[in-house]
Amino acid sequence: ASDVYKRQGRDMLANVDALGRPTPTARFMGGRDHELLTKGCVGSASLSDIAAVISKGIFIMPGRVPGVGPFPQARGGWRGAPPVGMAEKLASATLYLALMTQTCLALAGMGQRIILEGPLARNEPFARCLSALTGVAVHVSADATGTATGAALLLLKADHDPRLGPAVQPVDLPGLSAYAQNWRAYAQQAR
C-alpha cells in the first residue's frame, strides 16, 4: 500500500474509483470556507488584487471550519494585516483555496492534470493560481454533470473528454512562490 494512506490526522481516506481501485482522497470544507471568508462579497478576485495581497503579506490560515482538512488542529484566522475591502477579501480567499487545494492534492498524490468542475471552475484566478502552485496543467470543465460524464467516458473507453478546453495559463505573480512557502510554514506551525 502506498504511504499516502499512512498520513494520519490529515483528514484523508480511501475512496474507490469507477474501476474498483482504491483512490487516495484528501478533503477540506472549501465551499464552507469560501462562504465564511467572502460573506457579503460579490464577484471574484482580479489578478491585480491577488498581487496586492501577496505584496502586503495578507494570509488566511487553515481552520475556519475546525476539525477537518489537512490541518484539523488549526484555529483559522488572519496572519499579517487583515484585508481592506471586498477586493482584498476575495483575493485572500482565492489564494487560500488554491493553497489548500494544492496541499490536499500533494497529500493524495497529484496526477499529471487537474480538472476543475463546480463553482470554482468559474473562478479563473483560482484556476490560474492552482496551476502555478502545483506546476500541473489545470483544465476547466464546461460540463455541469462531470461525474455522469466521467462514468460514460469510462464505459465507452474514451481517452479524453471533448468538453475540456486547453489548460489555463498559470499566473506569473511576483512573490507567489515565497508567499506559498510562508503560508505552508505558518500552516505547519498551526498543525
Regions found by a protein language model. Give the residues of each.
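Active-site core segments that coordinate phosphate-bearing ligands/cofactors
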Residues: S2-I115, R122-R191
